[in-house]
């Protein structure tokens, strides 16, 4: 059963501290863990033995990147499944692009900041976290959804082609148009992390990628697409990512699903607070899908981080 603990990745230079959480294998009995404002506002709790000792040694690590204006807890059922399967799972709230702090959500620079934050999370987990001595640094994976999918692809070696996607950035409807007009395209390179050997990418925002963006991607990838899409992601945009990947990958299309199907099934309080992420087509069963999805993600990471050791 999973253990659970909160973490804080320390501030670095001009980068703020990052609040996060870790799930991990544990022998103690789990219980519902109150998450403060998240529980109060949305009725969400996680299942785990809070701050209990970890079970195991040389365990694989999976890091998680959430979507735009979201929260690390929105993938907690997957984290619990992976922890039950022998993985350490670490997630953060991206600075300025999470539910409780949206101050940088509309800034193009946040797309560069996000991969750097996940690299900082990995650094922390391997060197300064209470679980550092139990992690196998040769077995690291990433899960990313939506903007977090863009983050995951970048970490795996993909590079945005700002000039190549100028048509998108300059569209009058683009939230980025004024920023590009005033400041030009981003000038610093996006962060890659060769320590990451496998990635599960769900409905990634792919608007800044072109065919040449993926030349340096060599890791094993499981790519998920919702049939109906949403929030700037379409079935075709995800399929285009798959066609551009230079190595073989595992691809899944979730029939009848919208973009937010990859988020946890909604309880009443969450559905009332943020209804747009909780509405599914009548023919789609999100809880049933998550049982299959979580199992498939676990099997992929077991094959590529455990079995391939």
Give the role of each language-model region.
Residues 1-62, 270:
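Domain-level recognition of soluble alpha/beta enzyme cores
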Residues 19-36, 150-166, 250-271:
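Short, solvent-exposed beta-strand-terminating loops
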Residues 27-48, 164-211, 228-230:
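Mobile cap/lid helix-loop segments that gate and shape the active-site cleft of serine hydrolases
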Residues 44-59, 64-101, 229-234:
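Short substrate-entry loop that stabilizes the transition state in hydrolases
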Residues 58-60, 136-138, 193-198, 216-221, ...:
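Short, proline-enriched alpha-helix->beta-strand connector loops that line the catalytic pocket
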Residues 107-138, 150, 154-159, 164-180, ...:
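Alpha/beta-hydrolase active-site loop
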Residues 142-144:
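Short beta-strand immediately N-terminal to the catalytic nucleophile in serine-hydrolase-like folds
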Residues 216-289:
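Active-site-adjacent alpha-helix of alpha/beta-hydrolase-fold enzymes
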